[in-house]
Amino acid sequence: MDSPCQPQPLSQALPQLPGSSSEPLEPEPGRARMGVESYLPCPLLPSYHCPGVPSEASAGSGTPRATATSTTASPLRDGFGGQDGGELRPLQSEGAAALVTKGCQRLAAQGARPEAPKRKWAEDGGDAPSPSKRPWARQENQEAEREGGMSCSCSSGSGEASAGLMEEALPSAPERLALDYIVPCMRYYGICVKDSFLGAALGGRVLAEVEALKRGGRLRDGQLVSQRAIPPRSIRGDQIAWVEGHEPGCRSIGALMAHVDAVIRHCAGRLGSYVINGRTKAMVACYPGNGLGYVRHVDNPHGDGRCITCIYYLNQNWDVKVHGGLLQIFPEGRPVVANIEPLFDRLLIFWSDRRNPHEVKPAYATRYAITVWYFDAKERAAAKDKYQLASGQKGVQVPVSQPPTPT
């Protein structure tokens, strides 16, 4: 990448943005698309993805993947991107790519606790950090790392050594990930993407367990909460199984859920007025690759208690141009589409309510994902009496995993 003012090469692979001289790729006026493509893994920076569109807008096609990336200067560090005036610009770093509205540079540059907007931080009762506290300040020399889990301190090396370092650093890593990355991203954008969440070793074991569930015939066609008059296969084409994580052959899935629980637990009290006291079982989902997807929908349109959606992807060597299966999110009130590729070891987090209508485009290869929804205590209690909940939600609330008691 040459400079923040000339974002290369990611911008060349993305559709033209509003106000550009080229003809827009979207059929509808006022629509831009936002891609998260061709990441270079980096444990130092969050995988921000910062979009939004009106919920009534229709879906577009997938965004082309970038064919090259750069390991030179990061515009995240150079303060490129943000929101001011509504002009969309691409933002890329080692491990993070987004399109955000021009301005709000310090948020993108500093990750958590941005200096701007200062009024927001004053309302939250906190002060902006000094530049020395930026996430990369103490670890700039580790940019060349290509492996790493949730821990920012994992050095490169063998898979076993990296996994050991990740597990050793877990007590502090979830808190850092939550406070520095997820909380600010969710506050400002309502969507957060984190690559290399578990690391290749544990992620591979989770994938093996999911494949075993499919081979064993454990997956069943996904059901609908409502719209019973419409054939389910015309709306959603996935096969699912609900897993708690302690079943035989599901130990690694349980470890994944414990990792996600740890991160969400550290977000508690920092994501609006939500009181998160539990979650669903893990929904293991497989699109068999026969051209089926999931039409645009909202996870929680009627207040059933779900407030946060977390999706973990398990698809190695996935090419959305060949395999399809793109997840598109249409954040409410902003004329852009978030294109999320279902890449291996990627964690996606977004609000479950009407703020984030989304759909899965037709998949032409086997596509795996694990989804869990976290409950807001008050809304969930009211929903139990008001609604007939789906079989995957009713009576399966699982307490958020607690850290082990020190011995």
From Swiss-Prot:
Induction: By estrogen. Induced by proteasomal inhibitor MG132 (at protein level).
Effect annotated for changing residue 367 to K: Eliminates hydroxylase activity on a HIF1A peptide
InterPro entries, per database record: HIF_prolyl_hydroxylases (IPR051559), Oxoglu/Fe-dep_dioxygenase_dom (IPR005123), Pro_4_hyd_alph (IPR006620), Pro_4_hyd_alph_FE2OG_OXY (IPR044862)
Tissues where the protein occurs: Expressed in adult and fetal heart, brain, liver, lung, skeletal muscle, and kidney. Also expressed in testis and placenta. Highest levels in adult brain, placenta, lung, kidney, and testis. Expressed in hormone responsive tissues, including normal and cancerous mammary, ovarian and prostate epithelium.
Annotated consequence of substituting residue 119 to A: Cytoplasmic and nuclear localization. Reduced transcriptional activity of HIF1A as for wild type
Resulting phenotype, residue 106 to A: Retained in the nucleus
Motif (Bipartite nuclear localization signal): 89-134
Cofactor-binding details, from the entry: Binds 1 Fe(2+) ion per subunit.
Subcellular location: Nucleus
GO molecular function, one term: L-ascorbic acid binding
Region (Beta(2)beta(3) 'finger-like' loop): 225-235
Modified residues (Phosphoserine): 130
Listed GO CC annotations: cytoplasm; nucleoplasm; nucleus
Iron among keywords: yes
UniProt keyword Nucleotide-binding present: no
Positions that bind Fe cation: 297, 299, 358
PTM summary: Ubiquitinated by SIAH1 and/or SIAH2 in response to the unfolded protein response (UPR), leading to its degradation.
Impact noted for substituting residue 367 to A: Eliminates hydroxylase activity
Domain Fe2OG dioxygenase positions: 278-376
Protein keywords: Dioxygenase, Iron, Metal-binding, Nucleus, Oxidoreductase, Phosphoprotein, Ubl conjugation, Vitamin C
Intrachain disulfide bonds: none
Subunit structure: Interacts (preferably isoform p40) with SIAH2; the interaction targets both SIAH2 isoforms for proteasomal degradation in vitro. Interacts with LIMD1, WTIP and AJUBA.
Protein name: Prolyl hydroxylase EGLN2
Species of the source: Homo sapiens (Human)
